[in-house]
Curated annotation (Swiss-Prot):
<dbReference type="InterPro" id="IPR004528">
    <property type="entry name" value="KdsB"/>
</dbReference>
<comment type="pathway">
    <text>Nucleotide-sugar biosynthesis; CMP-3-deoxy-D-manno-octulosonate biosynthesis; CMP-3-deoxy-D-manno-octulosonate from 3-deoxy-D-manno-octulosonate and CTP: step 1/1.</text>
</comment>
<dbReference type="GO" id="GO:0005829">
    <property type="term" value="C:cytosol"/>
</dbReference>
<keyword id="KW-0808">Transferase</keyword>
<protein>
    <recommendedName>
        <fullName>3-deoxy-manno-octulosonate cytidylyltransferase</fullName>
        <ecNumber>2.7.7.38</ecNumber>
    </recommendedName>
</protein>
<dbReference type="InterPro" id="IPR029044">
    <property type="entry name" value="Nucleotide-diphossugar_trans"/>
</dbReference>
<comment type="similarity">
    <text>Belongs to the KdsB family.</text>
</comment>
<dbReference type="GO" id="GO:0033468">
    <property type="term" value="P:CMP-keto-3-deoxy-D-manno-octulosonic acid biosynthetic process"/>
</dbReference>
<keyword id="KW-0548">Nucleotidyltransferase</keyword>
<dbReference type="Pfam" id="PF02348">
    <property type="entry name" value="CTP_transf_3"/>
</dbReference>
<dbReference type="GO" id="GO:0009103">
    <property type="term" value="P:lipopolysaccharide biosynthetic process"/>
</dbReference>
<comment type="pathway">
    <text>Bacterial outer membrane biogenesis; lipopolysaccharide biosynthesis.</text>
</comment>
<keyword id="KW-0963">Cytoplasm</keyword>
<comment type="function">
    <text>Activates KDO (a required 8-carbon sugar) for incorporation into bacterial lipopolysaccharide in Gram-negative bacteria.</text>
</comment>
<dbReference type="GO" id="GO:0008690">
    <property type="term" value="F:3-deoxy-manno-octulosonate cytidylyltransferase activity"/>
</dbReference>
<dbReference type="InterPro" id="IPR003329">
    <property type="entry name" value="Cytidylyl_trans"/>
</dbReference>
<keyword id="KW-0448">Lipopolysaccharide biosynthesis</keyword>
Length: 248
């Protein structure tokens, strides 16, 4: 099947300045992400960035760059600018791969594209089971609850669903009901255009989760269990050292 990968790579980062260009074992991080995307079999891969240094690093690795504005409030807004500049048709399948995921398995990039293509829905994503209490109660691990058909009912930083009987006895173990959302999305290009036309929702501001805008406006997001679990993403200097060690 045919799909396009867009990798948003914003240069500024509060916790890790110049994050796309940090060195991981001899290569800029954004180049590692580009290589994972190439392994997925995508028809086209575009790095969307607001900084010339990132563009030069990507082009030196043979990648395609789309320069975007620096004032976007979300990765989806940056994608929308690329969609318009490249003139993608509304039915083009777009996969948003985060620029700080150098260990993302190529198989799940393709999985989310295929998941979307098989359904009459504008957006799809992935999740993995949560097995530890530490992760279940960590607000940085976004949880998702699904309906009987695998569509998202809600995403939250809170522990959902709340296992009343289990947690009344102990908060040290979790059952098999919690899913952690992965930050990879598949969209049809026309859906991205619609998304950015909607006003931000109260829920996305409360939780700081942009996907809640989709549910707020009554649209569906299909969620599949990922075929592979991604490695560590890079948000902090500690994450960076961990990834360097894991990728040696």
């Amino acid at each position: 099947m045919s799909f396009v990968v867009i990798i948003p790579a914003r240069f500024s980062s509060t916790r890790l300045p110049g994050k796309p260009l940090v060195d991981i074992n001899g290569k800029p991080m954004i180049v590692h992400v580009l290589e994972r995307a190439r392994e997925s079999g995508a028809e086209r891969i575009i790095v969307a960035t607001d900084h010339e240094d990132v563009a030069r690093a990507v082009e030196a690795a043979g990648g395609e760059v789309c320069m975007t504005r620096a004032d976007h409030q979300s990765g989806t807004e940056r994608l929308a600018e690329v969609v318009e500049k490249c003139g993608f048709s509304d039915d083009t399948v777009i996969v948003n791969v985060q620029g700080d995921e150098p260990m993302i398995p190529a198989v799940i990039i393709r999985q989310v594209a295929e998941n979307l293509a098989q359904r009459q829905v504008g957006m799809a994503t992935l999740a993995v089971p949560i097995h530890s209490a530490e992760e279940a109660f960590n607000p940085n691990a976004v949880k998702v609850v699904l309906d009987a058909e695998g569509y998202a009912l809600y995403f939250s930083r809170a522990t959902i669903p709340w296992d009343r009987d289990r947690f009344a006895k102990s908060l040290e173990t979790v059952g098999d009901t919690c899913l952690r959302h992965l930050g990879i999305y598949g969209y049809r290009a026309g859906f991205i255009r619609r998304y950015v036309s909607w006003q931000p929702s109260p829920l996305e501001h409360i939780e700081m989760l942009e996907q809640l805008r989709v549910l707020w406006y009554g649209e569906k997001i299909h969620v599949a269990v990922a075929k592979a679990v991604p490695g560590t993403g890079v948000d902090t200097a500690d994450d960076l050292e961990r990834v360097r060690a894991e990728m040696r």
